[in-house]
Amino acid sequence: MRHKKSKSNRETYLENATDILRKGLFKQKGYKVPKVQLSVSWATRGNRTKHGQGVKVLGQCFPTGLCDSGINQVNITPYLDGSTLKGTLRILGVLVHELVHAVDDCASGHGAPFKRCATAVGLTGKMTATTETEWLEDYLKANVIKPLGLFPHAKVMTG
């Protein structure tokens, strides 16, 4: 399926990006991403002040057992800004992180199986707060951003 740059909404963009990542990056690395439902919404937990510093939950993946649909639900925070290349890369990195959770239906948390998959697909750093390797950024630019454009969303600020 060919994806065209468009003025799509955020969820359509995430669906198209997930389709590209599922059939490309994850498949190439030997991982199967199940069907997921995607949305841009505030986290159900986190986003509070902890020891005087703000804690932002950038994404969440809910296991199928918590979803009446039986399909993993992935949420990306509207706090992130997709209006720049850097911002879109970060949003896509968070999406990749949440798709890693979906691969095993959130069974391994951020443990060893999660880390194996995450590092294979180009995530690095502390597994609870991964960042994108240069290799993953290059992959996302060429395979997701080139056909889809920037993520159609500007940062939403909260009080």
Language model regions located:
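Active-site recognition of the HExxH zinc-binding catalytic motif
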Residues: 90-106
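Metalloprotease/metallohydrolase-associated module, dominated by Zn2+-dependent proteases
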Residues: 2-86, 106-159
